[in-house]
């Protein structure tokens, strides 16, 4: 009879033993019949069930040694005292039909306690997820700070050299090679950094460092060593810091940058260390299988001689300045029409798939891997911020830097012109 309340507070569990065979409806009838009139109208079971304060009475029976055992459950929405009174009333039932019965309340369960336990367990799960999301929030803050720092890049001097906002006011200046190096140091909070911008020392740099402590921060390879020698010979340098062996400044993490700057050494010690290395090490060149093309060999990473002069359409030339600092690459076809733009980090893989690629301009370094892919795809030219360590270079590909690009008088040019003096003879 009746129905289960929507949200019961308590469940009365009782056991009844009957000395005879009866049906479930006989037991339920006995409960309602014998409880009727005992507690008054406010606690009458039938009325309570009609109003939803007592739910459906569930009865399960089994036979045991000639006795019928009934397990009874009664859900209620009453308060604790009223529920206890109903439970005691159930225990007063001593007869079902013609058979004697004995009733005992086994327990009164607090349904809300179970709900509270589930709430606690769920709260623990949600709290753990919240804790897991905290690092992501920190990363978000770090990303915002990183972008703000990168946005602080300024142009210094008549050469418009990329640098940090504190390069003029700080008593110490960190000299790096290129714009990408400046961006990485700014990203990690070093605002007194400025780029050399090439092999020739700009006049603005010479005047800037006259009364400052100068730290030269170079890549940890042969190219970095050569740049260090060149700068030391032409400029006042107090200390030299090097990236870890084989690493570039633009790729270092915050910890690696801090460690490299902390381990800086005076110029004299740096030059002495280079001489010791030169005496101790025997250079061993591994045999390299190269494509069947005429090669130009360059033992240095940033050899200015390998950068060739190239003439490009006016539209392409004008876009060079916009490309700086974006870390993007633009793929052109033979007529210098844009095929697509891609992030520099994806350029090598994307070039393998593009069919109409003929020229590439990138805000990044021209690496040996990029040259190899360009050769297999039949590209005519690669133009980058600088040229990396090129061991093998096919003659039919022009390698140029932004500084060696010339603007054509024509807007559209079907083929690439290169200065005769810049080409290397076979």
Swiss-Prot record:
Chain residue ranges for the region called Disordered: 407-426
The keyword Magnesium is annotated on this UniProt entry: yes
Cofactor note: Binds two Mg(2+) per subunit.
Compositionally biased region (Polar residues): 413-426
Domain of life assignment: Archaea
UniProt domain Toprim: residue ranges: 171-245
Positions contributing to Mg(2+) 2 binding: 219, 221
Alphabetically ordered keywords of this record: DNA replication, DNA-directed RNA polymerase, Exosome, Magnesium, Metal-binding, Nucleotidyltransferase, Primosome, Transcription, Transferase
UniProt-listed Gene3D superfamilies: 3.40.1360.10
Subunit text: Forms a ternary complex with MCM helicase and DNA. Component of the archaeal exosome complex.
Name the record gives this protein: DNA primase DnaG
Name of encoding gene: dnaG
């Amino acid at each position: 009879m009746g129905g289960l309340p929507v949200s019961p507070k308590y469940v009365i569990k009782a056991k009844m033993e009957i000395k005879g065979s009866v049906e479930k409806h006989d037991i339920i009838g006995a409960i309602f019949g014998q409880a009727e009139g005992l507690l008054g109208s406010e606690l009458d079971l039938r009325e309570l069930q009609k109003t939803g304060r007592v739910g459906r009475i569930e009865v399960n029976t089994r036979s045991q040694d000639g006795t019928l055992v009934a397990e009874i459950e009664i859900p209620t929405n009453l308060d604790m005292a009223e529920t206890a009174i109903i439970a005691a009333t159930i225990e007063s039932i001593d007869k079902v039909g013609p058979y004697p019965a004995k009733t005992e309340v086994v327990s009164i369960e607090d349904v809300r306690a179970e709900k509270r336990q589930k709430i606690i367990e769920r709260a623990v799960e949600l709290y753990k997820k919240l804790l897991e999301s905290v690092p992501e929030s920190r990363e978000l803050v770090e990303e915002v700070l990183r972008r703000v720092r990168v946005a602080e890049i300024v142009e210094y001097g008549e050469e418009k050299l990329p640098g940090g906002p504190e390069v003029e006011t700080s008593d110490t200046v960190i000299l790096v090679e290129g714009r990408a190096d400046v961006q990485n140091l700014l990203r990690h909070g070093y605002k007194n950094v400025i780029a050399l911008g090439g092999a020739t020392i700009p006049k603005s740099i010479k005047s800037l460092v006259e009364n400052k402590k100068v730290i030269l921060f170079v890549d940890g390879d042969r190219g970095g060593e050569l740049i260090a020698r060149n700068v030391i010979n032409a400029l006042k340098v107090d200390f030299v810091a090097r990236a870890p062996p084989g690493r570039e400044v633009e790729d270092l993490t915050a910890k690696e940058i801090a460690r490299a700057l902390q381990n800086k050494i005076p110029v004299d010690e740096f030059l002495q260390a280079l001489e010791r290395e030169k005496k101790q090490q025997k250079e061993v060149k591994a045999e390299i299988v190269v494509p069947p093309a005429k090669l130009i060999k360059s033992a240095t990473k940033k050899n200015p001689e390998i950068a060739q002069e190239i003439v490009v359409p006016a539209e392409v030339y004008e876009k060079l300045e916009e490309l700086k600092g974006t870390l993007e690459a633009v793929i052109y076809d033979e007529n210098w029409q844009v095929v697509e733009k891609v992030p520099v980090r994806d350029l090598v893989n994307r070039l393998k798939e593009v069919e109409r690629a003929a020229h590439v301009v990138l805000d990044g370094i021209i690496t040996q891997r990029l040259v190899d892919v360009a050769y297999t795809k039949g590209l005519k030219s690669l133009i980058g911020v600088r040229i990396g360590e090129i061991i093998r270079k096919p003659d039919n590909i022009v390698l140029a830097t932004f500084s060696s690009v010339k603007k054509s008088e024509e807007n559209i040019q079907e083929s690439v012109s290169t200065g005769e003096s810049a080409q290397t003879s076979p």
